[in-house]
């Protein structure tokens, strides 16, 4: 085969080279068409997106944005993967989660899932899941020499570990065939529940036992989900997990375990969100950070971090939960491309209670489709070489390292957690994010955008309650969920939802965009829009409003028609009994009580509206 020169392989070889200056001029022209007078770098900034942690995503990345060399897969700093072959041999480990307190029900689900694509089991034990005494029944019929098991037992970690090891021995499983993690995570449990960890002795003993007898079994899990579920940014999640990992290394070393052996006993668990590029960068940055810890510990070859990625519970919604299938698909893709060793796709009904068989099937099939039909695991580190991904990985790693150093200056994760430093930093991040959610700057499809008021509620059996205390647990949809709950209660009590009359002025071309915007905004709070007749004026508005059954109204039209008719129509609506008259857009008009527009505080508007309507 003839090898072509480089220019023969380049699709752009016959085109003249473009420069940043040329691109900036073209961008200026586009941005100016939107009414903004910008030039130079300001045009690029207008198209940039500010992320949490002080990071910025720009619209264009080129070779001059190249990050430091990420090395090769399987070699320090392990950015491109913990092993040279990545997930190519068989794809990532498809790990399903089980949290039912019923051993028989858990066993039925486990066997069904293992027969249909699941490759390992993640069992939640103790007060938040399955009783430790039910572990044997739950694993009845499971070939323990073939199926890795990951435990998550909180304060009962040592007891659960001993029970699992007893089951391995009873089943005659060879020591070198035992695989999985015992899941001891005293600091993660403290972060989640507030229960202080007084001793690492039991954990160290488990680590020593695994190191000496079970080479495929890890004793500890560094679970970053408690921080993510409290509202942490990606860098805070990474920084807290890094600090926790370092605490465990110190504790194990103090108990006599060698540094290299201590590294081999840790598995890390991270959240994967629907922000696919941030998820990819987060997992790559996590490996780089852990490799740095191994390097300064004098064992650089031990820094290959084992990762378990879980689709984010924070992003899941209770309303229109079917959309969660789309969110978890993107999150799973990000986790796989990011190089996670094991991936758990939470069922779409996760936030509603215990998943049913259909939800579990969709969850496991998400990985199957991405692996078997989309062939995501056929390429090692497919995001590697992307200037954007490499730069985002580098910037995120630096931001996480800064947070890690702040924790270390506070005497480590134990002290920082108990002093409130970690919780305070995360709370501040979540407060800013809540503002974006309230203003719909971070849209939630099916909740704050395009809600479906006529949806039938999805009901599930309640999951075991998580222990109280510790860091708070947040959800993106919580403010809108509260508003929708008030609307539901009103519907049950009166037979109708609170209503808003959409007073559309002029032809469809003039009012459709703002009428659609207003309808979606009010539905996000459970307020039903009434848009009949299609168009009104000052003479017909009062009669139409009275017939609508609504108690508030919202004018929707063009700026030109607002100038001509808004004040007269608003007076007519108030004369007909409207408690409040809104206008979709901005301006200063008599008899208009409030303006709704892109970026307004939708939660505040909807809360005050329901209050005035007497909706409890």
UniProtKB/Swiss-Prot annotation:
Pathway: Metabolic intermediate metabolism; propanoyl-CoA degradation; succinyl-CoA from propanoyl-CoA: step 3/3. CDD domains: MM_CoA_mutase_beta. Its EC number is 5.4.99.2. Coiled coil: none annotated. Keywords: Cobalamin, Cobalt, Isomerase. SUPFAM superfamilies: Cobalamin (vitamin B12)-dependent enzymes. Disulfide bonds: none annotated. It catalyses: (R)-methylmalonyl-CoA = succinyl-CoA. InterPro entries: Cbl-dep_enz_cat (IPR016176), Me-malonyl-CoA_mutase_sm_su_N (IPR024067), MeMalonylCoA_mutase_a/b_cat (IPR006099), MMCoA_mutase_b (IPR004608). Its cofactor is adenosylcob(III)alamin. One of its GO terms (biological process) is propionate metabolic process, methylmalonyl pathway. It is an enzyme of class 5 (isomerase). One of its GO terms (molecular function) is cobalamin binding. GO terms for cellular component: cytoplasm. Heterodimer of an alpha and a beta chain. Catalyzes the isomerization of succinyl-CoA to methylmalonyl-CoA during synthesis of propionate from tricarboxylic acid-cycle intermediates. This conversion most likely represents an important source of building blocks for polyketide antibiotic biosynthesis. It is unable to catalyze the conversion of isobutyryl-CoA into N-butyryl-CoA. Belongs to the methylmalonyl-CoA mutase family. This is Methylmalonyl-CoA mutase small subunit. It comes from Streptomyces virginiae. The gene is mutA.
């Amino acid at each position: 085969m003839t090898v072509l020169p480089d220019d023969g392989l380049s699709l752009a070889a016959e085109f003249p080279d473009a420069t940043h200056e040329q691109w900036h001029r073209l961008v200026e022209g586009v941005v100016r068409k939107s009414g903004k007078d910008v030039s130079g770098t300001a045009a690029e900034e207008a198209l940039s997106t500010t992320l949490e942690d002080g990071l910025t995503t720009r619209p264009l990345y080129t070779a001059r944005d190249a990050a430091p060399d990420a090395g090769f897969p399987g070699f320090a700093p392990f950015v491109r993967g913990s092993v040279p072959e990545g997930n190519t041999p068989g794809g990532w480990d498809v790990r399903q989660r089980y949290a039912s307190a019923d051993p028989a029900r858990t066993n039925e689900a486990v066997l069904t899932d293992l027969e249909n694509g699941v490759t390992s089991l993640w069992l939640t034990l103790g007060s938040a899941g399955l009783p430790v005494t039910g572990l044997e029944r739950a694993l009845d019929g499971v070939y323990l020499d073939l199926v890795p098991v990951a435990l998550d037992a909180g304060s009962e970690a040592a007891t659960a570990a001993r029970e699992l090891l007893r089951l391995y021995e009873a089943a005659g499983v060879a020591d070198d065939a035992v695989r999985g993690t015992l899941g001891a995570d005293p600091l993660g449990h403290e972060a989640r529940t507030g229960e202080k960890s007084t001793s690492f002795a039991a954990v160290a003993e488990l680590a020593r036992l695994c190191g000496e007898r079970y080479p495929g079994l890890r004793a500890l899990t560094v679970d970053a989900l408690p921080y993510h579920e409290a509202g942490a940014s990606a860098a805070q999640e990474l920084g807290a997990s890094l600090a926790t990992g370092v605490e465990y290394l110190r504790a194990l070393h103090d108990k006599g375990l060698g540094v290299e052996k201590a590294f081999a006993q840790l598995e890390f668990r991270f959240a994967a969100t629907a922000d696919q590029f941030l998820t990819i960068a987060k997992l790559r940055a996590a490996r780089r950070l852990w490799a740095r810890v191994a390097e300064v510990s004098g064992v650089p070859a031990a820094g290959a971090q084992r990762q378990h990625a879980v689709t984010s519970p924070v992003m899941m919604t209770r309303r229109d939960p079917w959309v969660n299938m789309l969110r978890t698909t993107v999150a799973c893709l990000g986790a796989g491309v990011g190089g996670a060793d094991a991936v758990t796709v939470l069922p779409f009904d996760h936030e509603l209670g215990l998943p049913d068989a259909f939800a579990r099937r969709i969850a496991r099939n998400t990985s199957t489709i991405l692996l078997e039909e989309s062939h995501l695991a056929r390429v090692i580190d497919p995001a590697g070489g992307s200037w954007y991904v490499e730069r985002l990985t580098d910037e995120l790693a630096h931001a996480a390292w800064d947070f890690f150093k702040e924790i270390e200056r506070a005497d480590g994760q134990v002290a920082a957690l108990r002093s409130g430093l970690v919780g305070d930093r995360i709370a501040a991040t979540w407060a800013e994010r809540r503002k974006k959610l309230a203003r719909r700057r971070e849209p939630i499809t099916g909740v704050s955008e395009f809600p479906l008021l006529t949806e039938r509620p999805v009901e599930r059996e309640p999951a075991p309650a998580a222990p109280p205390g510790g860091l708070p647990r947040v959800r993106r949809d919580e403010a809108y969920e509260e508003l929708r709950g008030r609307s539901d209660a009103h519907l049950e009590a009166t037979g109708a939802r609170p209503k808003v009359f959409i007073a559309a002025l002029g032809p469809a071309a003039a009012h459709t965009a703002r009428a659609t915007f207003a309808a979606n905004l009010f539905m996000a709070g459970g307020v039903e829009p009434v848009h009949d007749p299609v168009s009104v004026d000052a003479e017909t508005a009062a009669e139409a409003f009275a017939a609508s059954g609504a108690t508030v109204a919202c004018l929707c039209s063009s700026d030109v028609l607002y100038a001509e008719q808004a004040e007269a129509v608003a007076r007519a609506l108030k004369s007909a009994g409207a408690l409040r008259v809104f206008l979709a857009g901005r301006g200063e008009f008599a008899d208009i009580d409030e303006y709704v527009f892109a970026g307004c505080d939708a939660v505040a508007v909807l809360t005050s509206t329901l209050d005035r309507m007497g909706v409890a």
